[in-house]
């Protein structure tokens, strides 16, 4: 899917296996063996959490634009090109996905809306969906921030604190979760 979307571009895919118990690592190894120039695998011995996975991916990233995408297939790689355009043509440092129409239960949607409103108010960053895993960054942004603990939820704030003030958002499609929890 990513290969189809980015077919005519130079890109790399960095997979971070955060201590999965299924056959994720074997699949990553197969993908790397088939395309060692484009596919990088990082494996954790146990589950360290999303922030640690993002940090290791950011450390390994080499491309001019870095895109984060969760493996649960709720977000579509089809969105990458529009986000890339906002960075390259509109001058954004970071573009966050906004799941405007969510396919989650109310038990998740209501707390998410409250969290986003509070975070928007406290940070002064006009985003609707701080926690969307689909984001695009200039390489300089991911190299300037350090994501620890549960700080993946606050990456736009970390970026702003590091001097990257051009933060925008892109409405993205949201699918029901296919994998993971």
Q: Where does each model-flagged region fall?
A:
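Short, conserved SAM-binding/catalytic segment
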Residues: 31-35
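Alpha-helical transmission elements in cytosolic ATPase-linked domains
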Residues: 1, 23, 27-30, 56, ...
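Residues at the starts of beta-strands that form the adenosine-phosphate
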Residues: 10-12, 38, 166
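Short, acidic, metal-binding catalytic loop of nucleotide-sugar glycosyltransferases
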Residues: 1-10
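A conserved acidic beta->alpha catalytic loop
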Residues: 17-26, 73-74
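Short beta-strand/loop segment that forms part of the nucleotide-sugar
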Residues: 9-20, 42-43
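Acceptor/aglycone-binding surface of glycosyltransferases and processive sugar-polymer synthases
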Residues: 38-46, 50-60, 65-68, 77-154, ...
